């Protein structure tokens, strides 16, 4: 995570012997030391992604990230995202990273106000690592969901002002007795509510309606990690085809979606070479160059 102003964080004295003890002038208050975001909220709120400045108003000048998709397959889950960020009707960036590995068995995709969403993902990764270091054990998947929901809820004030940032969480539940069904996808609303997806796929962002429609039609083809990754690429291609804020594969610049595969072996980023190959296959299969389209000329000698 990026620390714009590095300074020593003051921890309150939690000693039971004195209710008035202080550390660097900070009064003793109850605090969940295993929560990194809670520590920042109490000790250094200026380091949080959003501080609830009521003077801020929504504006198209703020970059927004767009479409994220996730699909379960037997033995795991895949998450993928496009690379475009927009400012109103302008393209702000063509190579934004929107899918982040947050620990060994989870990944987070971001959509919405880019600055807040990116800090969500980074802070969440620190949150999980901080808990594991203090407690000596990793959070359960349910615990990871609750931690992220709390962070999203903390951004409600900004969301009500128009600065919405919504994550999509994918992971592998180590406590599931059936490893083939241990893939998990969780979506969130702006108030911190969360939903465990049972249909096997989900999408967030401006192109989500088109991506979900694509996955609904193609999900029956998912049998393993390779087929799930292909369907994810196709869904993002369909979203980019109808949503101007979602970027499709850019063959000229060599920019392609990013993706993460999560299985019992852990989370790993999919190589750009692998995704580029799938993207080219999708484009080739959908090309009309060798088919009779509306502008194709009928063969000579045939009746019109």
From Swiss-Prot:
Its EC number is 3.4.25.1. Pathway: Protein degradation; proteasomal Pup-dependent pathway. One of its GO terms (biological process) is modification-dependent protein catabolic process. Its main location: cytoplasm. Gene3D superfamilies: Glutamine Phosphoribosylpyrophosphate, subunit 1, domain 1. It catalyses: Cleavage of peptide bonds with very broad specificity. Residues 1-65 form a propeptide. GO terms for molecular function: threonine-type endopeptidase activity. Pfam families: Proteasome (PF00227). Component of the proteasome core, a large protease complex with broad specificity involved in protein degradation. HAMAP family: Proteasome_B_B. Belongs to the peptidase T1B family. This is Proteasome subunit beta. It comes from Mycobacterium sp. (strain KMS).
């Amino acid at each position: 995570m990026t620390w714009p102003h590095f300074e020593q964080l003051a921890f309150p004295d939690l000693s039971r012997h004195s209710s008035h003890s202080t550390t660097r002038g900070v009064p003793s208050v109850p605090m969940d030391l295993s929560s990194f975001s809670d520590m920042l909220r109490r000790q250094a709120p200026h380091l949080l992604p959003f501080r609830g400045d009521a003077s801020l108003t929504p504006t198209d000048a703020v970059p927004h990230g767009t479409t994220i998709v996730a699909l379960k397959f037997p033995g795991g889950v895949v998450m993928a995202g496009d690379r475009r960020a927009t400012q109103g009707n302008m393209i702000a960036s063509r190579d934004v990273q929107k899918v982040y590995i947050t620990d060994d068995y989870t990944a987070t995709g971001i959509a919405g106000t880019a600055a807040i969403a990116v800090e969500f993902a980074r802070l969440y990764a620190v949150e999980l690592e901080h808990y594991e270091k203090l407690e000596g054990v990793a959070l359960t998947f349910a615990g990871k969901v609750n931690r992220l929901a709390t962070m999203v809820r903390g951004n409600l004030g900004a969301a009500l002002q128009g600065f919405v940032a919504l994550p999509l969480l994918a992971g592998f539940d180590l406590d599931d007795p059936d490893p083939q069904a241990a893939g998990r996808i969780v979506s969130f609303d702006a108030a911190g509510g969360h939903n465990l997806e049972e249909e096997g796929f989900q999408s967030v962002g401006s192109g989500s309606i088109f991506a979900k429609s694509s996955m609904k039609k193609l999900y029956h083809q998912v049998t393993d990690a390779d087929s799930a990754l292909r369907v994810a690429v196709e869904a993002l291609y369909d979203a980019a085809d109808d949503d101007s804020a979602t970027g499709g594969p850019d063959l000229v610049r060599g920019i392609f979606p990013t993706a993460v595969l999560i299985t019992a072996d852990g989370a790993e980023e999919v190589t750009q070479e692998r995704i580029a190959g799938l993207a080219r296959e999708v484009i080739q299969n959908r090309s009309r160059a060798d088919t009779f389209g509306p502008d194709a000329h009928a063969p000579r000698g045939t009746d019109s």
